[in-house]
């Protein structure tokens, strides 16, 4: 579904309801904070989307929460189950240690969801991945059991870098670069350069 700059690159409840009614999808995939825009849905926006999803009980909900601990400017992270606990039986949360703990490329992730889904994914996964390398497993254990200040410290560093990049991008004549609220992406509008090369 299109999520233009005029909507802060976010899906509205009205858009979702119209698409759900028309297409009746089996799965709705939601990314918050957003990749590639870095926009973060507010509690009210998540609640409005959750209200819509309650109306469509035959649709699974997969939430890509990989950047949920990378939120800036004092904003919070909100999800559908917090808003509507009755969605719990059809929400699958996907998360990763890669971004939160600075382990990109090591591909250590996990999911939380209904037991039936977890069992099916375990079977599927066992046929595709033989094991996780021992060093990656050790790093994942250290990340999860070690000091949990790492994500907070990284967020401060990423927020400072974001502010520098945004200032530099917006100093370029004609470039408009909205301030991302999470993740580590910037999504500049460089349409001022279209047709000039």
Q: Where in the sequence are the language-model features?
A:
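PLP-dependent class I/II
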Residues: 1-197
């Amino acid at each position: 579904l299109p999520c233009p700059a005029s909507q802060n690159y976010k899906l509205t409840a009205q858009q979702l309801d119209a698409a759900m009614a028309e297409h009746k999808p089996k799965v709705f995939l939601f990314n918050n904070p957003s990749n590639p825009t870095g926009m973060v849905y507010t509690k009210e926006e998540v609640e409005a989307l959750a209200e819509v999803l309650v109306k469509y009980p035959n649709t699974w909900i997969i939430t890509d929460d990989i950047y949920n601990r990378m939120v800036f400017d004092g904003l919070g992270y909100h999800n559908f189950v917090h808003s509507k606990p009755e969605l719990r039986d059809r929400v699958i949360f996907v998360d990763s240690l890669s971004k939160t703990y600075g382990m990109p490329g090591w591909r250590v992730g996990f999911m939380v969801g209904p037991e039936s889904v977890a069992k099916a994914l375990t079977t599927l996964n066992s046929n595709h991945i033989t094991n996780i390398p021992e060093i990656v497993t050790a790093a994942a254990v250290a990340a999860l059991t070690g000091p949990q200040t790492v994500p907070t410290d990284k967020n401060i560093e990423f927020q400072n870098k974001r502010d520098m990049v945004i200032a530099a991008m917006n100093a370029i004549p004609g470039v408009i670069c909205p301030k991302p609220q999470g993740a580590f992406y910037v999504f500049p509008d460089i349409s001022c350069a279209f047709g000039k090369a």
